[in-house]
C-alpha cells in the first residue's frame, strides 16, 4: 500500500438527535427499511473515575479486535456500536454576563462520528439548567473516540460565549452499561455537568478496518448520483440540482439534470459507510405566476435521504420537487489504500540500500585497505547531515562535499539530509544522475557563477509577468499559491539560467543503481494558529515517497499535493515542480510572531502562557467514588477553559502564519487507533501538547501547513534517527548563525527526552574556541550512532591553505573570514556573494574536512566496530 496528502475535517460515523428533527437543508425523508444482521464479535470498554456504572452484571470485558503492535498495516473486521449521550443538567453554572444569569446550552462534537455539532436547547437565566435531552451516535470502538461537551452562553446581539469544554474519552465506557457521570467543572464553586452514557451493540454493521496501530482507515462507499428532469426543458440553459452528502469527501456538488434514459452527467460522493450519512437535494428555483405570488421565484424545500440503509448496487430513486428525480447507487470502494500505512522503509528504499551497500563496501575496502571484503551486515550506514542557513549553507555544503569526495567519504555515504538552504545544493546536484562520480569542482564553479550574478533582473516586469503565469498555472492545477511559491521562483532564478521543470520523483534516476547517496529533505508540519511549542511534526521527502514517521503514513512522491480521503486517492494533481519544493523547504516567511519571539529570547514563556488556553485534568478529583476500570489506557478527562477575548485576539496576532505553505493532507479522513498513544513508534515522536488531544491532530485537517525545520531546530537529524534506517555514523555539517553548538545541543536534549538513542552533548568549549571537528559517541547505548560534528569556523585555516601547507605572508588575508559578524558578507539574508567571498567559504569548508581526515577515519572505525558488536550480540 502507498500513501498521500489531502484532508478536511470530516471523519467517519454519523450521529442523530434523539429528540429533535434533522437540521440543515430540509426534513422531507424517504427511508428504506434497515437490513438486520448479526454482530461477528463484541467489544467492551471500561468504567472510570468519577462515574457511576449501572447494571454491572451486564458489562462486557474489553477484547479489542485489532490490537496493533507491528510496524506493518493489518486488515480486519470490527463491529460498530450505538452510543446514547443524555445531557441531564448542570449545577451552579458560571455567570458569563454581569447583569444576568447564563443563557446556557451544551454542544456535542464527536468528530470520529460526524463533523456536525449537535446542541441542546437554550435555557435562559438559570443557575441550575436541566435539559434531559438524548443524542445518538454510531461509533467504531477501534478508533480513539473523544467526545467534546462545550458549555456556552447564548447571546442574541453578539457572538455566543464559549465558557468551557469537557474532553471525555469514550473508551472508558462498558458495553451494555449505563454510565452516569458528574463532571466537576469548578470544585470551589460546585459547578458540575451531569451526563449519562449508554454503549450498545449495533447488530447491522460490521466494517473492514485497515490500521498500522496508529492510524485507522475505515470502510468507504461511493455514491453515484444522476439527476433526471421529468418534463421537457423549455430553456437551453440547464439548472443544476444542489446535492450534499454529509461527512463525504466532496460535501456539496451541482448535478445537471438530463432526460431519461441517458445520464451523461453524474456526481460521485465518497463517504464512510457506517457514518449514518444523509443526502440532501435541492431543486432549482421555479418561477411563480405574479398574480398568485408576491415574488418572481419560489424556493423548493430540500429533501433528505439517509444513506446507511441503501443496498450496494441497488438503484434508489428520490423525488426532488415536482419536476426532478435523483437516481442514486451506492457501491463499496476498494480496500486497497493509496497511502502506505507502515513504519518500515518502502520497498524502493530497501532495494536502494542493498545496491548502495555494494558501492560502500568496495569504497571502504580501498579506504581502510582491508584484507578481506566486508560482509553485508558489516557495511556501516553513513549519513551526511546538513543544516540550514540560506546561501551560506548552500555554498558551504558544496565545499564540504568536495572535501568528502576527495577523502572518498562521499562514495561511502548512504544518505544525505538537508533543510533550508542546504536543499538548494542537493536539488541542483541530483539533477545529474551521475553527480557524485564526477569532479565536483565543475559543479562548484557553475554554482559560483549564479551566486555572484545580479539578482535584480528577477524583479523586472517581464520576469514577474512570466512568474505570474507560472503561479496561475500552479493554482489551476489545484494548489493553493502563497508568497512561498514566489520565493521558490526566485530561488530557481538564483540557481540557474532557465526554468527547471524537474520534479522530486525525477531524482530516482540518480538512485537506480545505488550510484549516489539517497537525499532526504526535511520540513515540519505545523498549525496556522498554534505555536511550534504546542504542535509540530516531522515531515520528510525523498525521491521515493513523502510522509510522517510519527503516523507511519507515506505516499509516493509523485502524489504529493494530490487529494486523498481515508487513505484513498480522490483526485490526482500534477506533482509540483522543484522550484515550489525549494520554496517550501526554505520557507523563511512562514514564521509567526510567537515562534520568532521564542527563537530570539529565552523568556518566551511569558507570551506562551499568557495566550494559551487553561487545561484542567479532573480525572483525580474526589467528587465521586472510584470505580474499577477494564481499560488501562484511557485519556484523562480534561476541562478546557478558553482564554479571554483580549488574550485570544493577541494570540491570533502572534500565531498567524500569512505565508505558510499549504498542501492537501493525505491523512484526511483517517482516524487514530484507540491505543495509538501506546504504539512504540508514535511514542518515539510524541513531543508536543496536542499529541494527547486526538481531535486536534493532523488527520482532521484539510491541509498540511509545512514550515522550514530551522524554526524549531536547525538540523535534519530526524529522518536518520528512524530505527528502520539503522544509521551508524552521521557527519554533522553545521551552517547556522548564532551559537554553533545550539542545534547539536538541542538534538541531544530532544533525543534524551524522547528516549531516542543518541550521543550525549560533550562539547566543553564555547563558540569562540571551538575545534574544527568533534567525534561523539554513547558507549552505553548500542543503537546510538557515532556523530562527527563540523562547526563552520575558521581556525587553522587562517594559517594553512591546505593541510600541512602554511600560507605565505601574502596569502594570510585569504584565510580571514568574517562569517558571523554584524557586517558579514555571509549573513543569512544575503543571496549574492562576491567571487572572493564565495571562494573563501568553499575553500574553508573543504579544508576543514580534509584537515580532519584522521578524526573521520576514527569515527568510521568506531561505527564499524559498534556495528560488528551489535550484530554479534543482538538485543
UniProtKB/Swiss-Prot annotation:
Cofactor: Ca(2+)
Presence of the UniProt keyword Translocase in the record: no
Ranges of Low complexity composition bias in the record: 61-70
Entry binding sites for Ca(2+) 1: 97, 103, 153, 155
Compartments, record wording: Cytoplasm, Cytosol; Early endosome membrane; Lysosome membrane; Cell membrane
Protein task: Calcium-dependent N-acyltransferase involved in the biosynthesis of N-acyl ethanolamines (NAEs) in the brain. Transfers the sn-1 fatty acyl chain of phosphatidylcholine (fatty acyl donor) to the amine group of phosphatidylethanolamine (fatty acyl acceptor) to generate N-acyl phosphatidylethanolamine (NAPE). Similarly can use plasmenylethanolamine as a fatty acyl acceptor to form N-acyl plasmenylethanolamine (N-Acyl-PlsEt). Both NAPE and N-Acyl-PlsEt can serve as precursors of bioactive NAEs like N-arachidonoyl phosphatidylethanolamine also called anandamide.
Protein name (record): Cytosolic phospholipase A2 epsilon
UniProt source species: Mus musculus
Chain's gene name: Pla2g4e
Amino acid at each position: 500500500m502507498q500513501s498521500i496528502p489531502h484532508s478536511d475535517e470530516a471523519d467517519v460515523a454519523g450521529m442523530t438527535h434523539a429528540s429533535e428533527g434533522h437540521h440543515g437543508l430540509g426534513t422531507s425523508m424517504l427511508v428504506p427499511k434497515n437490513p438486520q444482521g448479526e454482530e461477528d464479535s463484541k467489544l467492551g470498554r471500561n468504567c472510570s473515575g468519577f462515574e457511576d456504572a449501572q447494571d454491572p452484571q451486564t458489562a462486557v470485558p474489553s477484547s479489542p479486535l485489532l490490537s496493533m503492535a507491528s510496524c506493518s498495516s493489518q486488515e480486519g473486521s470490527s463491529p460498530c456500536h450505538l452510543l446514547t449521550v443524555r445531557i441531564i443538567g448542570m449545577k451552579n453554572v458560571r455567570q458569563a454576563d454581569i447583569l444576568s444569569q447564563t443563557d446556557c446550552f451544551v454542544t456535542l462534537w464527536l468528530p470520529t462520528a460526524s463533523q456536525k455539532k449537535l446542541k441542546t436547547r437554550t435555557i435562559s437565566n438559570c443557575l441550575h439548567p436541566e435539559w434531559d435531552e438524548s443524542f445518538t451516535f454510531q461509533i467504531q470502538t477501534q478508533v480513539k473516540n473523544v467526545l467534546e461537551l462545550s458549555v456556552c452562553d447564548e447571546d442574541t446581539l453578539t457572538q455566543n460565549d464559549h465558557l468551557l469544554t469537557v474532553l471525555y474519552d469514550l473508551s472508558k465506557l462498558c458495553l451494555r452499561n449505563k454510565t452516569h457521570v458528574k463532571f466537576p467543572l469548578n470544585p470551589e464553586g460546585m459547578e458540575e455537568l451531569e451526563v449519562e452514557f449508554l454503549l450498545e451493540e449495533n447488530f447491522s454493521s460490521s466494517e473492514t478496518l485497515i490500521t498500522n496501530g496508529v492510524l485507522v482507515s475505515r470502510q468507504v462507499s461511493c455514491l453515484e448520483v444522476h439527476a433526471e428532469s421529468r418534463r421537457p426543458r423549455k430553456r437551453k440553459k440547464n439548472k443544476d440540482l444542489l446535492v450534499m452528502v454529509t461527512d463525504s469527501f466532496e460535501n456539496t456538488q451541482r448535478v445537471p439534470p438530463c432526460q431519461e434514459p441517458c445520464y451523461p452527467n453524474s456526481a460521485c460522493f465518497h463517504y464512510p459507510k457506517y457514518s449514518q450519512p444523509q443526502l440532501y437535494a435541492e431543486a432549482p428555483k421555479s418561477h411563480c405566476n405574479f398574480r398568485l405570488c408576491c415574488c418572481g421565484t419560489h424556493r423548493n424545500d430540500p429533501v433528505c435521504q439517509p444513506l446507511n440503509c441503501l443496498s450496494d448496487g441497488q438503484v434508489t430513486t428520490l423525488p426532488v420537487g415536482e419536476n426532478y428525480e435523483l437516481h442514486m447507487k451506492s457501491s463499496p470502494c476498494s480496500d486497497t489504500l493509496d497511502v502506505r500505512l507502515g513504519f518500515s522503509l518502502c520497498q524502493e528504499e530497501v532495494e536502494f540500500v542493498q545496491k548502495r551497500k555494494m558501492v560502500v563496501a568496495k569504497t571502504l575496502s580501498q579506504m581502510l585497505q582491508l584484507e578481506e571484503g566486508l560482509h553485508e551486515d558489516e557495511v556501516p550506514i553513513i549519513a551526511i547531515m546538513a543544516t540550514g542557513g540560506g546561501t551560506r549553507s548552500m555554498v558551504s555544503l558544496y565545499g564540504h562535499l568536495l572535501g568528502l569526495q576527495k577523502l572518498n567519504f562521499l562514495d561511502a555515504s548512504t544518505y544525505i539530509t538537508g533543510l533550508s538552504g542546504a536543499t538548494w545544493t542537493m536539488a541542483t546536484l541530483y539533477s545529474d544522475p551521475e553527480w557524485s562520480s564526477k569532479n565536483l569542482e565543475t559543479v562548484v564553479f557553475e554554482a559560483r557563477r549564479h551566486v555572484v550574478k545580479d539578482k535584480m533582473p528577477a524583479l523586472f516586469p517581464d520576469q514577474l509577468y512570466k512568474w505570474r503565469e507560472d503561479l496561475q498555472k500552479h493554482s489551476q492545477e489545484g494548489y493553493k499559491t502563497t508568497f512561498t511559491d514566489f520565493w521558490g521562483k526566485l530561488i530557481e532564478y538564483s540557481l540557474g539560467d532557465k526554468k527547471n521543470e524537474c520534479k522530486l520523483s525525477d531524482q530516482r534516476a540518480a538512485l537506480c543503481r545505488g550510484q549516489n547517496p539517497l537525499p532526504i529533505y526535511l520540513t515540519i508540519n505545523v498549525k496556522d494558529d498554534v505555536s511550534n511549542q504546542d504542535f509540530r511534526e516531522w515531515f520528510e521527502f525523498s525521491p521515493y515517497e513523502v510522509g510522517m514517521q510519527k503516523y507511519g503514513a507515506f505516499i509516493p512522491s509523485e502524489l504529493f499535493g494530490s487529494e486523498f480521503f481515508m487513505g484513498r486517492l480522490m483526485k490526482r494533481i500534477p506533482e509540483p515542480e522543484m522550484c515550489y519544493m525549494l520554496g517550501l523547504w526554505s520557507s523563511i516567511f512562514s514564521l509567526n510572531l510567537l515562534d520568532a519571539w521564542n527563537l530570539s529570547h529565552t523568556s518566551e514563556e511569558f507570551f506562551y502562557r499568557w495566550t494559551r488556553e487553561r487545561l484542567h485534568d479532573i480525572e483525580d478529583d474526589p467528587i465521586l467514588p472510584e470505580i474499577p476500570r477494564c481499560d488501562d489506557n484511557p485519556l484523562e478527562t480534561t476541562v478546557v477553559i478558553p482564554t479571554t477575548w483580549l488574550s485570544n485576539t493577541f494570540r491570533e496576532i502572534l500565531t498567524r502564519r500569512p505565508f505558510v505553505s499549504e498542501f492537501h493532507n493525505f491523512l484526511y479522513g483517517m482516524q487514530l487507533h484507540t491505543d495509538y498513544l501506546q504504539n512504540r513508534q508514535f511514542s518515539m515522536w510524541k513531543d508536543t501538547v496536542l499529541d494527547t488531544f486526538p481531535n486536534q491532530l493532523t488527520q482532521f485537517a484539510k491541509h498540511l501547513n509545512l514550515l522550514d525545520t530551522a524554526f524549531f531546530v536547525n538540523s535534519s537529524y530526524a529522518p536518520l534517527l528512524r530505527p528502520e534506517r539503522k544509521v551508524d555514523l552521521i557527519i554533522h555539517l553545521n551552517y547556522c548563525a548564532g551559537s554553533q553548538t545550539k542545534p547539536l545541543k538541542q538534538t541531544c536534549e530532544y533525543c534524551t527526552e524522547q528516549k531516542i538513542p543518541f550521543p550525549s552533548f560533550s562539547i566543553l568549549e564555547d563558540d569562540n574556541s571551538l575545534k574544527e571537528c568533534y567525534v561523539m559517541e554513547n558507549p552505553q547505548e548500542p543503537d546510538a550512532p557515532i556523530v562527527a560534528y563540523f562547526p563552520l569556523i575558521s581556525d587553522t585555516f587562517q594559517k594553512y591553505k591546505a593541510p600541512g601547507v602554511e600560507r605565505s605572508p601574502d596569502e594570510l588575508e585569504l584565510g580571514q573570514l568574517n562569517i558571523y559578524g554584524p557586517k558579514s558578507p555571509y549573513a543569512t539574508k544575503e543571496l549574492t556573494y562576491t567571487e572572493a567571498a564565495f571562494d573563501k567559504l568553499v575553500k574553508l569548508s573543504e579544508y576543514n574536512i580534509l584537515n580532519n581526515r584522521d578524526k573521520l577515519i576514527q569515527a568510521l572505525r568506531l561505527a564499524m566496530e559498534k556495528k560488528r558488536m551489535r550484530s554479534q550480540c543482538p538485543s
